[in-house]
Amino acid sequence: MKFVDVKNDIAFRKIFGNEQKTLILISFLNAILKLEGDQRIKEVTIINPYLLPRVAGEKASIIDVRAKDEKGQQFVIEMQVADVDGFDKRVQYYTCRDYSMQIDRGEQYPLLKPTYFIGILDFSFFDSPAYLSNHLILNEQTYEHTLKDIRFTFIELQKFHKTVTELQTLTEKWIFFLKNAENLDLIPENINDQGLIEAYKDADKHAWQKEELIAYDNASIAEQDERGKIIAAEKKGKIEEKEKVVKRCWQKKMPIKDIAEISELTIEQVQAILKKLEKQ
């Protein structure tokens, strides 16, 4: 077996947006949200099922998987591979929007059902070392949890370091799958949950159609391009900041040697920036 990178947009939607295998999504939600007893999800309806892009290279129109359970509760599961500006604002905006759009004007508020956002992040976002975190609306003084309809759960893959032999809970096994499936050749022996087993089977490249593999490769290229843009933007921002430091120091008549030390640049780099500033 050769597994795909589950973090890939096409792979993610194919596995979790499969209307024929909703047990995959049910298992994932119950494990990540740690639902027990009557709270456990028994059925889900996928609102935006998996579809291939219409043309080669087209960005997938569905970047997440949305579903409802038998109680009407909404779930938004999103894979985010890069830390883009405003990510936290967007998450809150779209989750609250989905919550409010459950009813039309004039309908009663009690019809609103809880909305859960699950963000799978391939980068570190919070300062905490925890790889799984839940964010609720709590009373600041008493920590009372009365406002329960909106909840955010984040999985930060870069903070998860357990090996396959260290996996104990189904939650850990799901997160291991998300992060490491592409590096495996077989389904781990300690995987006994049927939903997760089916997820591994759907992640097997040998079971994919040619069109799906092409779309998968296109999505991988698009992802690398996007990461490259972000890195380039960060690099440009750092260079511009260095130039500002050099300019301020030069205006204060500081020696080039001191400017280089303060800006953490070489003397040659400082001189090049000064020449550039002279031409402006």
Q: What do the PLM-derived regions correspond to, one by one?
A:
Residues 1-280:
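Elongated, amphipathic alpha-helical interaction scaffolds
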